[in-house]
């Protein structure tokens, strides 16, 4: 288990915590932040947090940025909160490490 995410090697799934900032100038993953001793990946999203628009844009952005299928990305916690838990299916751990390490400064 990495301190930034929980990877299940038998199912090729990962749980990842996001700290989302809606109404941003651009869609951007910046780095990590610790909130209540829990690490979160910081994600700025252009969409407003109304009627699921920001949640939809989160899924679209992550799928495009990380070259994943939209159907393999699901928000499982925090639908109406800026702190979210994302489930990503069908992802290789080596590829996931490459993605995550690219945001660590």
Curated annotation (Swiss-Prot):
NCBIfam families referenced in this protein's UniProt entry, alphabetically: DUF167 family protein (TIGR00251), PRK01530.1 (NF002419)
Superkingdom of this protein's organism: Bacteria
Listed transmembrane segments: none
Protein name: UPF0235 protein RF_1332
Gene3D superfamilies: YggU-like
UniProt cross-references to Pfam families, sorted A to Z: DUF167
Family: Belongs to the UPF0235 family.
InterPro entries: DUF167 (IPR003746), YggU-like_sf (IPR036591)
Cellular component, GO annotation: cytoplasm
SMART domains, per database record: DUF167 (SM01152)
């Amino acid at each position: 288990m990495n301190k930034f995410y929980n990877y299940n090697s038998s199912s090729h799934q990962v749980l990842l915590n996001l700290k989302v900032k809606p109404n941003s100038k651009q869609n951007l993953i910046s780095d990590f932040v610790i909130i209540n001793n829990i690490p979160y990946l910081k994600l700025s999203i252009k969409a407003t947090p109304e009627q699921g628009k920001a949640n939809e844009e989160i899924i679209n952005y992550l799928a495009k940025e990380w070259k994943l299928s939209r159907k393999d990305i699901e928000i499982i916690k925090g639908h109406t909160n800026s702190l979210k838990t994302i489930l990503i299916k069908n992802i290789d751990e080596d590829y996931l490490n490459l993605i995550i390490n690219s945001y660590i400064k």
